[in-house]
């Protein structure tokens, strides 16, 4: 009772302080002695006085915000510890709806006004090249350019180089795909190991030779198989600059579908490996093969301390435009950056491909003659019918003149007299003969050039960084700085076309089953990293490290590398051969199973009340997994908890850094179930049947759904007992609409069930925030009405089907070449609809032949109840050349603008361009897409990367799956015929703009609201339910685990807490990498009564007091991938992040 009084008093105190503070503010502004009334005339001095008053008012608001924040923390502390009365139970009203009483705990939504300034933008200079504007202004015509088909004729004056020689760097390279036509291991065995073995011997033959490598995954495998002498030689070659490892990631990742967690993780894995084994730190980025480029990647490379980068696969019309305006080299800047802290120097290759015919100059017929692997007698030749000729004394002058002409023409497209000429292709240099042919012939050409000053050319072999260093030197700037006159660019390079209207927008969806599995593995990896790091730190602090399975670190390392491998631009993209896809799938599943073990082991240790009782037994795990997959291409099957006379315990893991109020659904073997909290309080639950089809329930399996509050990054405990509590075990009611179909229906005495043979009337589901209408005919969503609004918002959902062209060029794994607009999906039979209603959730499932569409509405306060949970179970294995799309039609006046995320890191505005074909207007959607007008925003959140567009105002359209019977002539040699039953998961969030908050139309940036960010996190990081194994008696106690002393500010995301490897072997060190991301957010969307706790702190976090029961004994800010310390370690553990920034810290917990 005493605690309850304290809570009441503190709650009242907040109100009083707020009112009193506002009174003081107004009072101080009103009675200012310097203020005079001027009858409406405001001289300049008065305006400045007014500005001062406004600034003072802002300062006072800020102070007020801080006071309330402090009081809020006190109240939350009190309420968290309060053993209040049991919560009121849900009840059923006369009008047929469930009411869940409000929670006794207060919720806070307290955002500092200063934190709202960032999204308003308007600071800093605009870049010369904004890609959204470039795309709007370009004609995208495809005029024949002569020998450079997609470009133009290039001419020059031979005297252009009289004042300054042309400096040419020829960069030998071999592009090794970690899986595409062959599996990773097969490529390694048959080609890659031979390339790297030859590299060591051939580079040592002549110190003038150079070689560029990118994929650390292959390099690490090779390293494990070579002897000490060869390793020493490799270190020497790296040390003297003959061998450069560019980018240094585990793979060269896809930039469309990959999530930024995985992009960073594979970069860290590569960089850490290079530092440990070679002492190498990458300086330049090399991305010749990803199919379009995200602006997230330059940000990550810059924060990893790289100074330059190169890209290749950009739309041919953009390449031509940039070549014509000498803009192929630019400083790439983030759209939100108000100065130049995110700038990185970027080189865009000008021609069609990264192969030799398209890299020496504009004429592939001539360049092919200088690819000496194609000398007569070899296995490949020149398609232009003029073969290369070996360079001799007799022909060197003529051959050199021909090549120099190409070099000079290519250099006319750039601003400096330093020229980059890559020399390589896929899996090149795999035989010693090729090394000899290329290096000997080119060296003869270089010797000829360099011995004739009248030619004004200096040519040599080089690495990528050799080229960039020479360019910086020529332009007189420090490495990475902006050379005078070079443009600044912001935006991204999607979508990509390599010729005609062949847009590479199909791979945004291709093989969605594995795109989904990728994200499941990612969420498990992050969860396992965090729990493992916390468990190891707590075990060390308690002196129990010897008992804890620290060897799980090898499982973590393998999973990091599996996730990294799958970010490769032929893996997550869905563009590999079927056997290679199976290989990836098997790897993904193996790592997923291993990560579940890591999570179980860590949760077991952390949830024990008495750590001394901890005993690790791999043969008899303390916890069970939440679900299992029978094979890599099967959907998960949830664990059924067997109830009997003794209670069963379940440990719940919340991977979010925010406290979470969520619905947890468990499967049990009886409808007679009681659920108790950790303290033994009985909880209200909703019990439902578990369905195997539209009308058939699984016998002896029931779903029990219970709302639970879980600590940030923490563990909660539930107890399940056999028995019935009529007040708290609340059954769902079910209606099944058969639409005239003759089907048998499972019935159960525990659940009221009504069968409706032919009803077609629309019906609604509702919760405390909204009423949602569905079509009685289709079972699909029709409209949403928020409870505080009179009018409903049209949100009309449809299923559509795309065909492919009848002409020669058809859609395939890469390309989307539809036969026109999509047509409505016409089912053979009307759908069966199953409507479930209950106290905590209601849902509608529409069963069609090719898609089961479920929409669920949670009747909970906070994030869970503010959006619709949507899942689409898709099976198109009987389709021929068709693609299935989900279409949402609204009356939002979006004016041709829509927004898609880039890698889950940032949002990029898009404009529907009528001048381009339909397929050009599709973009990647890794986590969200939205449309908006002055009043509303509708966001579709996704748990897997898919392709999205808005083809008309007020519409969003997502491609769910594609089945294509033919190759699209990009080297794969297969169609997409290995479709799986795939579950795509979404959240649909409707938000209203607050009065007076403008939509930032003219801006090149846009930001989700805080609610939207949290909704995405809930979808992508679900709570895990881990039952305590039956044979394990929990003994004296399982206790919830609260790792954080206080929640992080709600604009902060703890991206990872990653245990670092020890120097000597595969064991963990005592250090972890803490990676934080401060998100940019839009304050202009409704933020009242949201029912969840959220405060911001102007970017400040006290890391020293963040972890409960652990001290931060060492803290070192570093570059993104930990290769560079950014400041000396200090005693202060307070850190500050600007919005949108990601920061990495090396820390030791003890």
UniProtKB/Swiss-Prot annotation:
CC annotations in GO: Golgi membrane
Positions with a binding annotation for Zn(2+) = 175, 177, 289, 569
Which GO terms of the molecular function aspect are on file?
alpha-mannosidase activity; carbohydrate binding; hydrolase activity, hydrolyzing N-glycosyl compounds; mannosyl-oligosaccharide 1,3-1,6-alpha-mannosidase activity; metal ion binding
- Provide the cofactor note recorded for this chain's UniProt entry: Binds 1 zinc ion per subunit.
User: Subcellular location, in the record's words?
Assistant: Golgi apparatus membrane
Residue ranges in the Cytoplasmic topological domain are 1-5
**SMART domains xrefs:** Alpha-mann_mid (SM00872)
Does this UniProt record's set of keywords contain Hydrolase? yes
Q: Which reaction does it catalyse?
A: N(4)-{beta-D-GlcNAc-(1->2)-alpha-D-Man-(1->3)-[alpha-D-Man-(1->3)-[alpha-D-Man-(1->6)]-alpha-D-Man-(1->6)]-beta-D-Man-(1->4)-beta-D-GlcNAc-(1->4)-beta-D-GlcNAc}-L-asparaginyl-[protein] + 2 H2O = 2 alpha-D-mannopyranose + an N(4)-{beta-D-GlcNAc-(1->2)-alpha-D-Man-(1->3)-[alpha-D-Man-(1->6)]-beta-D-Man-(1->4)-beta-D-GlcNAc-(1->4)-beta-D-GlcNAc}-L-asparaginyl-[protein]
* Function summary: Catalyzes the first committed step in the biosynthesis of complex N-glycans. It controls conversion of high mannose to complex N-glycans; the final hydrolytic step in the N-glycan maturation pathway.
Q: Which family does it belong to?
A: Belongs to the glycosyl hydrolase 38 family.
Subunit structure, interactors included: Homodimer; disulfide-linked. Interacts with MGAT4D.
Q: Report what the protein is called.
A: Alpha-mannosidase 2x
Which gene carries the instructions for this protein?
A: MAN2A2
């Amino acid at each position: 009772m005493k605690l309850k009084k304290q809570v009441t008093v503190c709650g009242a105190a907040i109100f009083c302080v707020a009112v009193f503070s506002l009174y003081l503010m107004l009072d101080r502004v009103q009675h200012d002695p310097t203020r005079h009334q001027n009858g409406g005339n405001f001289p300049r001095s008065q305006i400045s006085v007014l500005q001062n008053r406004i600034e003072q008012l802002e300062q006072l608001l800020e102070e007020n915000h801080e006071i309330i924040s402090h009081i809020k923390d006190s109240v939350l502390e009190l309420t968290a510890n309060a053993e209040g009365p049991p919560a009121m139970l849900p009840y059923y009203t006369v009008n047929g709806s469930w009411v869940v009483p409000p929670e006794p705990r207060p919720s806070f939504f307290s955002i500092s006004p200063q934190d709202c300034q960032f999204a308003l933008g308007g600071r800093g200079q605009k870049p010369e090249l904004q890609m959204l504007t470039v795309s709007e202004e370009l004609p995208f015509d495809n005029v024949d350019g002569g020998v450079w088909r997609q470009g133009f004729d290039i001419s020059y004056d031979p005297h252009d180089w009289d004042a300054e020689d042309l400096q040419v760097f020829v960069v030998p390279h071999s592009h090794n795909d970690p899986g595409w036509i062959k599996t990773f291991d097969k490529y390694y065995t048959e080609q890659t190991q031979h390339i790297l073995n030859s590299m060591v011997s051939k580079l040592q033959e002549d110190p003038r030779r150079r070689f560029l490598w990118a994929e650390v995954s292959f390099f690490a495998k090779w390293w494990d198989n070579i002897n000490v002498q060869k390793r020493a030689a490799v270190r020497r070659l790296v040390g003297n600059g003959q061998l450069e490892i560019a980018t240094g990631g585990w793979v060269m990742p896809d930039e469309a579908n990959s999530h930024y967690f995985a992009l960073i993780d594979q970069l860290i894995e590569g960089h850490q490996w290079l530092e440990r084994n070679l002492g190498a730190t990458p300086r330049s980025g090399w991305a010749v093969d990803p199919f379009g480029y995200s602006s997230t990647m330059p940000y990550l490379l810059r924060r990893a301390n790289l100074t330059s980068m190169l890209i290749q696969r950009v739309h041919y019309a953009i390449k031509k435009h940039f070549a014509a305006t000498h803009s192929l080299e630019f400083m790439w800047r983030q759209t939100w950056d108000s100065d130049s802290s995110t700038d990185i120097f970027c080189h865009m290759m000008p021609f069609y491909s990264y192969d030799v015919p398209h890299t020496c100059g504009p004429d592939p017929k001539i360049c092919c003659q200088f690819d000496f692997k194609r000398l007569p007698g070899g296995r490949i030749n020149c398609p232009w019918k003029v073969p290369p000729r070996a360079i001799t004394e007799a022909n060197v002058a003529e051959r050199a003149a021909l090549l120099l002409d190409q070099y000079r023409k290519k250099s006319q497209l750039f601003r400096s007299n330093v020229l980059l000429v890559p020399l390589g292709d896929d899996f090149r240099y795999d035989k010693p003969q090729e090394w000899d042919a290329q290096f000997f012939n080119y060296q003869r050409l270089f010797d000829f050039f360099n011995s004739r000053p009248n030619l004004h050319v200096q040519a040599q072999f080089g690495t990528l960084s050799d080229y960039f260093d020479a360019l910086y030197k020529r332009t007189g700037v420090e490495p990475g700085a902006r050379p005078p006159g070079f443009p600044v660019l912001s935006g991204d390079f999607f979508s990509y076309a390599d010729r005609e209207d062949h847009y590479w927008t199909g791979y945004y969806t291709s093989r969605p089953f594995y795109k989904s599995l990728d994200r499941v593995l990612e969420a498990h990896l992050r969860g396992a990293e965090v729990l493992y790091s916390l468990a190891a730190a707590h075990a060390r602090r308690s002196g129990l490290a010897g008992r804890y399975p620290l060897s799980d670190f090898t499982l973590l390392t393998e999973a990091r590398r599996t996730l990294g491998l799958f970010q490769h631009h032929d893996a997550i993209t869905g563009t590999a051969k079927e056997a290679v896809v199976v290989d990836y799938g098997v790897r993904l599943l193996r790592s997923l199973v291993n990560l579940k073990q890591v999570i179980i082991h860590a949760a077991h240790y952390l949830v024990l009340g008495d750590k001394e009782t901890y005993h690790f037994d791999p043969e008899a795990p303390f916890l069970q997994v939440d679900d299992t997959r029978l094979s890599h291409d099967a959907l998960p099957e949830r664990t059924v908890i067997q109830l009997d006379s003794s209670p069963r315990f379940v440990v719940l893991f919340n991977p979010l850094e925010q406290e979470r109020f969520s619905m947890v659904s468990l499967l049990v073997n009886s409808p007679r179930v009681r659920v108790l909290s950790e303290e033994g309080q009985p909880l209200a639950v909703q019990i439902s049947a578990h369905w195997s089809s539209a009308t058939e329930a699984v016998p002896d399996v029931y779903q029990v759904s219970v709302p639970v509050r879980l600590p940030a990054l923490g563990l909660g405990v539930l107890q399940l007992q056999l028995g019935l509590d009529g007040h708290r075990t609340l059954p769902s009611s079910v209606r099944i609409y058969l639409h005239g179909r003759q089907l048998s229906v499972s019935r159960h005495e525990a659940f009221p069930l009504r069968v409706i043979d032919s009803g077609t009337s629309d019906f609604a589901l509702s919760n405390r925030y909204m009423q949602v209408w569905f079509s009685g005919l289709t079972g699909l969503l029709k409209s949403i009405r928020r409870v505080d609004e009179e009018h409903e918002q049209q949100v009309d959902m449809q299923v559509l089907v795309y065909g492919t062209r009848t002409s020669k060029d058809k859609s395939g794994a890469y390309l989307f070449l539809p036969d026109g607009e999509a047509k409505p999906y016409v089912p053979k039979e009307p759908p069966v609809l199953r409507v479930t209603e209950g106290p905590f959730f209601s849902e509608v499932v529409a069963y069609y032949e090719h898609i089961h569409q479920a929409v669920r509405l949670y009747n909970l306060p906070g994030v869970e109840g503010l959006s619709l949970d949507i899942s689409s179970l898709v099976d198109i294995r009987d389709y021929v050349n068709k693609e299935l799309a989900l279409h949402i039609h609204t009356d939002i006046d979006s004016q041709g603008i829509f927004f898609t995320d880039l890698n889950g890191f940032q949002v990029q505005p898009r404009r529907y361009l009528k001048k381009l074909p339909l397929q050009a207007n599709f973009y990647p959607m890794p986590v969200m897409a939205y449309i908006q007008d002055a009043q509303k925003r509708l966001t579709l959140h996704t748990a897997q990367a898919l392709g999205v567009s808005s083809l008309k105002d007020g519409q969003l359209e997502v491609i769910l799956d594609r089945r294509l019977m033919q190759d699209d002539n990009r080297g794969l040699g297969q169609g997409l015929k290995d479709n799986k039953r795939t579950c795509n998961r979404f959240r649909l969030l409707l938000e209203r703009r607050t009065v007076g908050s403008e939509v930032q139309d003219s801006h090149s940036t846009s930001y989700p609201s805080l609610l939207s960010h949290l909704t995405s996190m809930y979808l992508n990081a679900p709570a895990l339910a881990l039952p305590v194994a039956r044979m394990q008696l929990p003994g004296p106690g399982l206790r919830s685990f609260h790792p954080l002393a206080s929640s992080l500010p709600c604009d902060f995301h703890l991206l990872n807490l990653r245990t670092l490897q020890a120097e000597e072997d595969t064991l963990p060190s005592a250090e972890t990498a803490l990676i934080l991301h401060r998100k940019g957010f839009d304050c202009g969307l409704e933020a009242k009564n949201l029912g969840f706790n959220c405060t911001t702190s102007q970017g400040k976090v006290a890391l020293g007091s963040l972890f409960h029961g652990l001290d931060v004994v060492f803290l070192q800010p570093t570059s993104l991938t930990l290769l560079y310390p950014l400041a000396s370690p200090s005693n202060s553990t307070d850190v500050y992040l600007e919005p949108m920034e990601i920061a990495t810290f090396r820390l030791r917990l003890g």
